[in-house]
Regions:
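Nucleotide-state-sensitive switch-loop elements of NTP-binding domains
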Residues: 3-50, 55-58, 64-165
């Protein structure tokens, strides 16, 4: 069994490090990402996904934080995919407003992952829909997707989430 297969097995046990590694595989794309996608799609596990979108400074992170707090008050597990602009230097995510979610950083019932848009228009990363499915496979029943600050024509989130706010 190779390391990726071990990570996929570890996902079922709730291993957060394995989840982070598998999400990195999905973000990189290629054959390994397709293998993950095939396994996850065959499982039929899809979480409830809620897209949070709006113009820069509209309060997306503040709203996401409040929604996460509400679900955690009900003892529900919740994941957040926060799509950020890509750094022109590293290509990675510029960690924008994550400071508003710091109160959840040590909560084992919350998983927060920043993803770089990598120049993709529409407020998402190309890997976002598959990352949502991976989170569902890993046992996260609700996923909030916070987009990069977007304008009126960037509506990719409406196709990637069950509900859009």
């Amino acid at each position: 069994m190779n390391a990726q297969d071990e990570d996929l097995v570890a996902l079922e046990r709730g291993d957060r490090r394995a989840l982070a590694r598998v999400l990195s595989v999905v973000e990189r794309g290629g054959e390994a990402a397709r293998a993950v996608a095939d396994l996850v799609q065959a499982s039929g596990t899809d979480p409830c996904s809620v897209g949070i979108t709006g113009a820069p400074g509209a309060g997306k992170s503040t709203l996401t934080n409040a929604l996460v707090s509400e679900l955690r008050a009900r003892d529900e597990l919740v994941a957040v995919l926060a799509v950020d602009p890509s750094s022109p230097i590293t290509g990675g995510a510029i960690l924008g407003d994550r400071v508003r979610m710091q109160s959840h950083a040590t909560d084992s019932g919350v998983f927060i992952r920043s993803m770089a848009s990598r120049g993709h228009l529409g407020g998402l990363s190309l890997a976002t829909p598959e990352a949502v499915r991976v989170l569902g496979y890993a046992g996260w029943p609700t996923v909030f997707i916070e987009t990069v600050g977007v304008g009126q024509i960037e509506v990719d989130i409406a196709g990637a989430a069950d509900t859009t706010v």
